Amino acid sequence: MKVWFPAALLAAIMAALPPPLAAQWPLHPQAGVPKGADGKPNLNAPFPRTADGHPDLSGVWDIISARNLEPNGPPPGRPPLVRGGDILGAFKDGLPIQPWAAKLRENRTNSQGLFDPDGNCMPQGPVEYHIDPQPFKIVQTPRQILYISESNYGLRTFYMDGRRLPEMGSVPPYWHGYSVGRWDGDTLVVESNNFHGVDPDNVDAKDLPDIFRSAGWLDHKGAPYTEELKLAERFRRPNFGTLEIEVTVDDAKAYTKPFTFRIIRRIVADGSEMVEYICHENQNFLKLTAPRR
């Protein structure tokens, strides 16, 4: 049974754990890891390439403390860096958020993550996986790239076979959206739409099923997105040990204009793998809530 914690507390606990405790699995020597003179992984070495010449993004990518990264702000012309599970904190002037969405985010934050999808065995939002304290794994092939999160074993598929992104509403909405990818030089560009988001017309309904209260979480603070969300992600591997993800959120129902931010992850180079993660649904203890005094 999965014990529920407020999302912020869970993120702090996971971030504080050393890798062997946060994701423990039998170690197996990892091939292709460049080593320095001291025999340790050289994370600043050049990134590997696949047989077709593209950057190889494969591997397990873990959270990295962004506290000391870019203390003076992002480089000129670059989007802000998200630190932790709160996207709002990356923007000095706040998010360009619609009034109803700001109210919903506040309610979700004040509930201390009661309806956070991860705490309710529901799929997280696609951006939540990027900022989650648990690792994710990328499996890269020429025709598909699989993005697998350790959290609830969330799976996203990036189709690389040249297909076009379907029209909005032409396919059923998906928790992880429908994603197609292409290479722009050494950058993987992924575009996604047809998400299962929150319905702004029903956010105040008292009898709304919990499954819908857990829909459309952009981050751990509950910044919402609707089924109008169009997501653009740019994955770049500047060196062996670093994965930089640039995300643009375009959702006119929830935000007054598109906005862009970055996340940085670090390769797991010690042979660790993701652990099996099973979350049991219909957890009765989630119903044992009472007003906080």
Locate each region found by the language model.
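PEST-like low-complexity, intrinsically disordered acidic/proline/serine-rich tracts
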Residues: V3-P6, L17-R293
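Classic N-terminal secretory signal peptides
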Residues: L10-A12, A16
